[in-house]
């Protein structure tokens, strides 16, 4: 965390592990660290460079999933969140988004190969995916599963991406819709111009092992 290359702005989102504790403390850390920039449980940021603009919509997925809402002893804050309010906010932000590219980032996957409860993804498919499809977002990127995955599904032009973890990684196998998967630990970076948006998956040695490409 103190490496010179990490002295940049961080834009966090909440995941299931944060919901096991005090989620407000994660937001409040914004007041402690200059790098930590988390204005709310969900928020949006626009980055523009050399005439190309990307909108990132950072969302809070645990409250969208019944499993977390119903297990109030383990995830005490999840059931306190207004799910409909967040979904309406996502819809409103995407309605007015005019940037070249739009990327939505949440902790939980909509589509992915995983041994985790199917109900997690079915809730995401029921509640979030229709909004993303309606507004034709470019990429939905998530974590939670600790490996790299890229999927496309019939009826949707969205690239569904799972980003790996910087620590524990897990095995993965292809399923219907899988274009790429890898158990490597690592991270991803975005590059873009007016005609192409790339999400580069990078392993622990710094090698690009796969790139999600979108073109116009």
Predicted region positions:
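Extended active-site neighborhood of metal-dependent phosphoesterases/phosphodiesterases
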Residues: 1-98, 118-119, 123, 127-139, ...
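Residue-level signal for glycine
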Residues: 206-208
